[in-house]
UniProtKB/Swiss-Prot annotation:
Protein name in UniProt: U-myrmeciitoxin(01)-Mg9a
Function, in words: May have antimicrobial properties, like most ant linear peptides.
Domain of life of the organism encoding this protein: Eukaryota
Lineage of origin: Eukaryota, Metazoa, Ecdysozoa, Arthropoda, Hexapoda
Keyword tRNA processing attached: no
Signal peptide bounds: 1-21
Propeptide part(s) removed at maturation, as residue ranges: 22-48
Organism whose genome encodes this protein: Myrmecia gulosa (Red bulldog ant)
């Protein structure tokens, strides 16, 4: 009986410590007078006449080869 009361007391103290712990925030230590210079370029070409059936077949093959066995193994491990 004494051991269960001790464990319950320790569990309550542990939970209260977590609940009332101060929030910790990560702050960047940077020079406030630093210059922020950045360049971003994006170049892309889109083909409006893409053959979706060709890509759908490739995606389907990958799903059948890897996805279904993986899903089956996960389902078996859960049950």
């Amino acid at each position: 009986m004494k051991l269960s009361c001790l464990l319950l007391t320790l569990a309550i103290i542990f939970v209260l410590t977590i609940v009332h712990a101060p929030n910790v925030e990560a702050k960047a230590l940077a020079n406030p007078e630093s210059d922020a210079i950045g360049f971003a370029d994006a170049v892309g070409e889109a083909d409006p006449n893409i053959k979706w059936s060709k890509y759908a077949k490739k995606v389907g093959k990958v799903i059948v080869k890897h996805g279904i066995p993986l899903a089956a193994s996960i389902a078996l491990s859960q049950g």
